[in-house]
Each structure stands twice: as structure tokens, then as C-alpha cells.
Amino acid sequence: GIVSGEIVDMQGMLSPQAWGELNFIADPQCNRCGFPFDFDTGDVNEGNICAGCHKNPPLFDKARSALIYDDASRNVILSFKHGDQTYALPSFMPWLQQAGRGILARSDYIIPVPLHRWRILRRRYNQSALIAKYLSREVHVPHLLDGLQRKRATQTQGHLNANEREKNVKNAFTVP
């Protein structure tokens, strides 16, 4: 299976143990960033916006994630991203479709985040572009591979906190 190397029914599937360790994000969640709430706030007027979005409103209207980023999901994501497990992509599609159900239907394009050319040479593929291409086919929304352009290389972000990540990618991209 993905990550564990256990025998599963089909290539790209997760073992029952790995599946059971994943924490999927479901409602209730922040209407803006998708941050999961422990309980429904009942705040109809504010539209269930988290404290982080109230304090520092993001530059986007809506974002969603399929999984809480923890040890279990990190293993799955990094195995795909760095471990050449691109065959796992079909397994991710239902997760991404469910997480993005309210966003994808209203989207004009699915736009991947471009990698710096040196990082593509090391990895041999851009995982974001693969996801965009595959998801585009699944949800019938065109993907636009050159919708963003990378202006400069950035350091890897795995060891950075949220503020450091924001600073790291600031002014790294442009819309052509």
C-alpha cells in the first residue's frame, strides 16, 4: 500500500491500518480557510469564520483541505510528493472532490503551484501539476498549467512554521 508497503488489493490503495489513522476534515469548519471546528459555532451571521481569519483575513475567498496535516497524512503526502508514488493519485481524487465540493463547481480553472526548475529536475515531476491535471479530468473543470509563474526559488517548507512559510513564498509567484 501507499506508505506502508503492505499488500493491498490494488496499487495505490492504503492499508486498513493507514486508512484508519487518517483524519479527514468535515463540517463544521471555517467558511473561509476550512480550519476544522470541534463543534458547530451556530454563528450564522459571521458564517462560521475562525479566529485566525477574523484577525488576519486571507487573500482568498475559500480554501479546503481533505485531511488534517498530522503524522499519518504527512506520510501519505510525502510518499506521493517525494517517493515517486504517483500511482496513488487516483486514490486521492475522491478525497479532493469531497473537500472541494463547494469550490470546484464554481471554479473557472484548476491552477497548480509551479515548482522551480531545479526542484522539478530533482523530483522529476510537479505533484501539484499532476493533481491539477487529474482532478480537472474528474470534475470537468479545465486546468491551466501556466496560470501562475514562479519568479524565484524558495527554500523547502517542511521545517517552517506558518509565519515562516508565508514569508518564504512572499513575492515568489506572479500571475502572467
Regions found by a protein language model. Give the residues of each.
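Glycine-rich phosphate/pyrophosphate-handling loop used in enzymes and phosphotransfer proteins
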Residues: 1-176
